[in-house]
């Protein structure tokens, strides 16, 4: 279930109505009046939720799901366990996106500009001109917030934090002694779209951002909220200016990311990992504890703990050096040698 501090529950819907909305076919029409209250990922789904699987790699999770219903391709329908109603569609993720938009809505700041009467500020909080703080937000003692920054509804911001000017924070739980510099955007929707019957549609991003104690985030950097699970930045990690961290990323403790690093969705990064400037990481890979990624490198697969990888595509540094040396020798050879 999406966090109610950040997402409004729009009320239940029956499976029959959901089938019409999504363009899916309900296999068991006797289940048309079954009530759905939320969307969920396949694993650990609540009993009154609907989920989806568009990749056969998730069918083992479908077989074990506790969801009330699941959007599946017809070829995968048999994977649904007893008690899980199947809605057949050629575009399960698009159907899920439509269901998510019907059942959940992001909370937004309403009312007059300024600090909501429903926000909670501890003693010693300092606000610059033009700061907006939404309903239900909590700001810890000694935190300073710069001019024209926006703290969205429900956000929790710890003690002794420094938030510079023109920062936007939403859908986030932030620890103590966190430093976020000018222009950073925390908790915006992750980049998620899928192809439906009428073209590309946005997938509602229903997760949060968790930033632990002592983290620094540079100017104009972005940390997107999760698609459903959270985006997490571990304790004491230091992030430079203009860094992009996508949805569902999990960054460990004491990591360093130099400027222009880009981390794609659902990447897992261990503790003490270092990234040179303009390094990039493709989605769904794991980078082990203490690994290092060289500047302008492109990581396309898992990096083992403690190793240094460089190049495009990135590979172990010793291999890269041998390849570079061989290429230099070949380039220096005269014709006929």
Predicted features by range, described:
Residues 52, 114-316:
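Structural signal for interior beta-strand "rungs" in well-ordered beta-sheet cores
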Residues 1-114, 177, 183-184, 189-202, ...:
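Terminal amphipathic alpha-helical/low-complexity segments used for targeting or macromolecular assembly
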């Amino acid at each position: 279930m999406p966090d109610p501090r950040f997402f409004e529950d729009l009320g239940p819907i029956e499976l029959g109505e959901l089938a019409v909305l999504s363009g899916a076919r309900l296999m068991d029409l006797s289940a048309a009046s079954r009530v759905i209250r939320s969307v969920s990922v396949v694993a650990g789904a609540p009993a009154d939720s609907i989920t989806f699987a568009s990749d056969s790699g998730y069918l083992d999770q479908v077989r074990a799901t506790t969801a009330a219903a699941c959007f599946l391709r017809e070829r995968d329908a048999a994977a649904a366990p007893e008690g899980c109603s199947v809605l057949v569609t050629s575009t399960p993720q698009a159907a899920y996106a439509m269901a998510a938009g019907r059942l959940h809505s992001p909370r937004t700041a309403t009312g007059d500009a300024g600090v909501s009467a429903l926000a909670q500020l501890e003693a010693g909080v300092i606000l610059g001109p033009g700061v907006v703080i939404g309903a239900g937000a909590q700001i810890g003692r000694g935190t300073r917030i710069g001019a024209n920054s926006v703290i969205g509804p429900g956000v929790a911001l710890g003690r002794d934090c420094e938030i510079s000017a023109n920062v936007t924070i939403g859908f986030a739980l932030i620890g103590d002694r966190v430093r976020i510099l000018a222009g950073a955007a925390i908790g915006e929707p992750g980049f998620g779209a899928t192809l439906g019957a009428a073209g590309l549609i946005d997938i509602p991003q229903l997760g949060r951002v968790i930033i632990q104690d002592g983290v620094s985030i540079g100017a104009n950097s972005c940390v997107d909220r999760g698609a459903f699970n959270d985006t997490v930045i571990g304790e004491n990690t230091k992030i430079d200016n203009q860094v992009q961290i996508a949805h569902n990323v999990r960054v460990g403790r004491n990591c360093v990311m130099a400027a222009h690093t880009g981390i794609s969705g659902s990447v897992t990064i261990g503790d003490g990992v270092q990234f040179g400037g303009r390094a990039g990481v493709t989605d769904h890979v794991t980078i082990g504890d203490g690994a290092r990624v060289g500047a302008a490198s492109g990581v396309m697969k898992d990096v083992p703990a403690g190793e240094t990888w460089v190049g495009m595509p990135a590979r172990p540094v010793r291999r890269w050096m041998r390849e570079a040396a061989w290429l230099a020798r070949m380039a220096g050879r005269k014709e006929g040698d």
